[in-house]
Swiss-Prot record:
GO biological process: translation
Record keywords, A-Z: Ribonucleoprotein, Ribosomal protein
This protein's encoding gene: rpmG
GO MF assignments: structural constituent of ribosome
Alphabetized InterPro entries for the sequence: Ribosomal_bL33, Ribosomal_bL33_sf, Ribosomal_zn-bd
Name assigned to this protein: Large ribosomal subunit protein bL33
Pfam families: Ribosomal_L33
GO-annotated cellular components: cytoplasm; ribonucleoprotein complex; ribosome
Position of the signal peptide: none
Amino acid sequence: MPRDIIILECTEAKAEGKPTSRYVTTRNKKSLRTPGRLEKIKYNPFLKRRTLHREMR
């Protein structure tokens, strides 16, 4: 199965108008477990806490 490179961007920092943190990862596009956008809890160094990061498109 092919894997695609995706970028995860912080949603909370974007809403607050602060610098957003971004992470680069891969995902399996044909996976039945994650049909929509990928969401993960990752650390944002600008906010100094763990926040929700969503897949950018």
